[in-house]
Regions:
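Conserved short alpha-helical segments that host acidic/polar catalytic motifs at enzyme active sites
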Residues: 1-246, 250, 262-294, 332, ...
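Hydrophobic alpha-helical scaffolding
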Residues: 7-10, 100, 120, 135-139, ...
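Glycine-rich oxoanion-binding loops at beta->alpha junctions
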Residues: 67, 71-84, 273-286, 310-346, ...
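Structural motif
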Residues: 68, 96, 294-296, 342, ...
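Generic C-terminus detector
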Residues: 227, 542, 555-557, 567-608
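Active-site phosphate/pyrophosphate-binding segments
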Residues: 260-264, 268-296, 386-515, 588-608
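Glycine-rich phosphate-binding loops that contact phosphosugars or nucleotide phosphates
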Residues: 290-432, 436-439, 519-563, 583
Length: 608
């Protein structure tokens, strides 16, 4: 959510900042801006709309000369998208510039105090109060001014700051919003995420909570909010910039759909040894696993949907009760956590604000937390007691595909590990499931071969008004994700329902021609699901079914059927989701939607 890029060095800053911001477009934004120091003063340019507008306004940065600057893509929280509300924000004298991700929760009383002191506000944002506070406290010592401001503000922030009378320095600070800094032979960098600066350096430092960084051309210095200097170790990024490029695909989303076989294999391979599942990073003894009395899974969006699937899989295999919570609800409902409970948080970015808050709440109450994340060094990865990385590589499209599949795979392996240790499945069943797990990448390749068939069908529903997804058990979990994929990238109203709930109200919405996507991958629920399909078909619905090979009985209750390869019933989500991802993608493309960057959405939701 929003993006920050900063640079100070020997090169022209504006083109580097624009390039970096372009690598952060996946985070979601509605406007963009830059501040560049030209040797005498700080110049700013802002523009509502796509980054291209700012690029055109500045001729690719060529008409903003200077070797230090900060840039920002804004996702509106306080104040509508506008040039005035766009970042950077300045003090009244134009000598201090600030870019900010996050929310200053006490900005209203702070704003009033600054207005009472004569400061003039021009925007509706919470960020502008930072610029005026910095001006108020600045007496020639930037670090002192920044730390005084940080002691007064409440909320979350990632900051990039410039002072006109400090031409050889820029500053960064962080609390509860992601931020990294990096260094190369040609300068130093600030960024919200690695892809923004990977073209220029592989050496990065993760800024921790309530830390301030002073960046100069050849050096980085780290400080606490109490101005104590901190020693930090760099991290070398081991994937290259090409992994974050389209590689010939029309969209990142399509590329990432096709990367799922590799993603699943990369998640599985390091954790299978001698026909057993070994999760060394779990840091739990067999005795500790046996003592688990309940698991709480906490996540948001698609990650929450993987948690819903995991509930069925873990309860079915390991016989451990599982509760799944939307992260934004978890911490506010005063959850009952008892001895023997385990908390699992799931997040692709490792920076999801609500999930991070749930992690901290759980740890404060004395419970160990396992994080399932994709981004190495992210906040959740650093703060969780143990971490399972999904090794999906960079996922650029806002709508998750391969990270979702990797999360599912990690959860399958966790469930199987727990079941084997607790003795709730025998060796024969475990070995069979391990074989099925290893087959998933090849089976997904087969499903991807049906692309043209699915595209042809999707083109028929480009103009749909409503689409419903139904399923039972694990199929309900698949329905949740299929519906979310469709609505977030095509803007078609879509809902997912437990199939048995249709008759309790939702069936009144079915009319002639309404598309109902029915998931039927669970053999013990086939007949019940078919009954629900017949009910909607009798009311004029067009029924698209997704089921496993051999389930020919479903054809009489369907108008269109997609068959997936046969696998263990607990793993069907990984296969059934593929045609739903492709269907959503081609509907969105047919409607002319911005598939990789849907309106109003952000890849990493870093505010609560």
């Amino acid at each position: 959510m929003c993006g920050i890029v900063g640079y100070i060095g020997t090169e022209q800053a504006a083109p580097i900042i624009l390039d970096g911001l372009s690598k952060l477009e996946y985070r979601g934004y509605d406007s963009a801006g830059m501040a560049i120091f030209d040797g005498e003063k700080i110049n700013t340019r802002k523009a509502v709309g796509r980054l291209k507008v700012l690029e055109n306004l500045t001729h690719g940065g060529e008409n903003m000369k200077g070797t230090s600057g900060i840039g920002h893509t804004r996702w509106a929280t306080h104040g509508a998208p506008s040039d005035i509300n766009s970042h950077p924000h300045m003090n009244n004298a134009g000598t201090i510039a600030v870019v900010h991700n996050g929310i200053i929760e006490n900005y209203i009383p702070l704003k009033k105090k600054m207005q009472d002191k004569g400061y003039q506000f021009v925007s509706e944002t919470d960020t502008e109060v930072l610029a005026h506070l910095l001006d108020y406290y600045y007496k020639g010592n930037p670090l002192e001014a920044i730390t005084k401001v940080l002691h007064r503000v409440e909320g979350s922030y990632a900051l990039g700051i410039m002072f006109a009378d400090q031409p050889d320095k820029i500053f960064a600070a962080r609390k509860d919003s992601p931020l990294i800094v990096g260094k190369s032979d040609n300068g130093s960098f600030i960024a919200s995420d690695v892809p923004a600066i990977l073209k220029y350096t592989r050496t990065v430092y993760y800024v921790d909570n309530q830390e301030v960084v002073e960046l100069q051309q050849g050096s980085l210095r780290f400080f606490s909010v109490d101005e104590e200097e901190i020693e930090k170790q760099p991290v070398t990024i081991d994937w290259d910039a090409n992994a974050a490029e389209k590689a010939g695909y029309e969209h990142f989303m399509l590329k990432e759909i096709y990367e799922q076989p590799k993603t699943i294999n990369d998640t599985i391979s390091p954790r299978i040894k001698d026909n057993d599942i070994v999760i060394e990073e779990l840091n739990m003894s067999d005795e500790e696993i046996k003592e688990i009395t309940k698991i709480h899974i906490v996540a948001c969006g698609s990650a929450y949907h993987t948690g819903v699937t995991a509930k069925y899989v873990i309860e079915g295999l390991a016989r451990i009760p599982v509760e799944v919570d939307v992260a934004s609800e978890f911490r506010y409902r005063d959850p009952i956590l008892q001895k023997g409970n385990m908390v699992i948080v799931i997040s692709q970015s490792g920076e999801t604000a609500d999930t991070l808050a749930a992690l901290r709440e759980s740890r404060e109450r004395g419970f160990k937390v396992l994080g399932i994340v994709n981004v190495v060094g992210s906040s959740i990865a650093r703060e969780a007691d143990s971490v399972m990385y999904t090794w999906a590589g960079p996922e650029i499209a806002v709508a998750t595909t391969k990270a979702y599949s990797a999360q599912l795979t990690a959860l399958y392996m966790l469930a199987m590990k727990f079941a084997r240790v607790r003795g709730t499945i025998d060796q024969e069943k475990f070995a069979g499931m391990l074989t099925d797990l290893r087959c998933l990448p090849d089976q997904i390749e087969l499903l991807l071969g049906q692309k043209e068939k699915i595209q042809h069908f999707a083109n028929r529903y480009v103009g749909a008004r409503d689409i419903f997804f139904i399923g039972r058990g694990i199929d309900y979990a698949i329905s949740l994700e299929g519906s979310l994929k469709l609505k977030e990238i095509s803007y078609i109203h879509s809902e997912a329902y437990a199939a048995g709930e249709l008759k309790h109200g939702t069936i009144s919405l079915i009319e002639d021609g309404t598309l109902v996507v029915a998931l039927a991958t669970q053999p013990d629920l086939f007949q019940k699901t078919i009954s629900n399909m017949v009910e909607v078909k009798a009311r004029g619905a067009f029924v698209m079914a997704v089921t496993i090979e051999g389930n020919k009985a479903i054809e009489k209750a369907s108008d269109y059927v997609i068959y997936t390869p046969e696998t263990n019933p607990y793993f069907t989500n990984s296969l059934a989701i593929i045609p739903l991802q492709l269907f959503s993608y081609y509907v969105a493309v047919g409607r002319g939607c911005d598939v990789d960057k849907p309106r109003n959405l952000a890849k990493s939701v870093t505010v609560e």
